[in-house]
């Protein structure tokens, strides 16, 4: 049994309007979640594989998306929930946060 608390593993973007993936994170019921070192890596993967842009209202847009993070428990969390997890687990130096009101940025933890 793993007694380690849930922690942030990587940046991720949930593309809600794209076709549902076969093995999504356990708290996602539609769309796909793309993971990467930074959020721009996720955007680049979608653009490269689908030629769609990460914008909502455009003929070549992906539709609704949410920037967030994946956790060690295979959950997608938004920037605000990720900030709480990262603070609880000591993954961030609270005196050096990029924009704590917006939520966690990958630059805050690595």
Predicted regions: what is each one?
Residues 1-66, 71-110:
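Linear-motif-rich, low-complexity cytosolic tails and juxtamembrane regions
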């Amino acid at each position: 049994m793993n007694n380690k608390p849930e922690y942030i593993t990587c940046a991720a973007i949930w593309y809600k309007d794209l076709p549902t993936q076969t093995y999504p994170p356990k708290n996602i019921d539609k769309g796909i979640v793309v993971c990467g070192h930074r959020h721009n890596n996720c955007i680049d993967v979608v653009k490269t594989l689908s030629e769609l842009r990460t914008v909502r209202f455009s003929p070549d847009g992906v539709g609704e998306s949410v920037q967030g993070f994946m956790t060690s428990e295979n959950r997608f969390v938004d920037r605000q929930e990720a900030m709480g997890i990262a603070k609880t687990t000591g993954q961030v130096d609270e005196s050096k946060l990029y924009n704590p009101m917006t939520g966690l940025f990958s630059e805050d933890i690595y």
